[in-house]
Amino acid sequence: MPRVAYSEADRERVRSDLLSAALELMARQGVQHTTVEQIYRAAGISRTFFYTFFPTKEDLIVETFYRQQPRVLARAQSLMADPALTWREGVRQFLRDCCYGERSGIAVMTVEEQRLLFQRLSPESFRTFREKQFSLFSGLLTCFGVPASRENVQLFTNISLTAMVVRRAIPETLPFFVPEAAEATVAFQIEAIADALERMRRDP
């Protein structure tokens, strides 16, 4: 069978389709349970052609999270601009969307997924990932009207990811946590994060 010649525009479209498929699958079923085969089949291409875009699954994961960042920021901006919501309600809803990413289409890595990805990233790729992560959380603080100092960004990153990771970890990764209280635990953490952001706004 003759090979199909793809233009640059075609390749960009296929690449975008791959990232969109990856994001949808990873948000719904997790990074670890999303296979390369599921992604290239969803985009309608072959396995061989897939690897001309992303040499490894880890390359795809990183690019998928980069693709997601503007969408996450846009979601926060839309909530802050919603006249029907108070500031606190908007922050709460945003954090809920992140913690329950399988419902809202936001991909979040579990502890194990983070560990596996970190082991396979080069030092340079890890630095780039952290820089983009910092930029995202800085943008979110700015969107929430909170001074985006380095200290604020670092704290907000950790407390937000803690809530997301804990929610994903109960009960499989954290079997001694009480699964019946998982949702109440997430709600408590979200309120605590909102309290912290209010203090940052009030006392810059």
Task: Describe the predicted segments one by one.
Residues 17, 21-28, 71-79, 159, ...:
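Solvent-exposed, amphipathic alpha-helical segments
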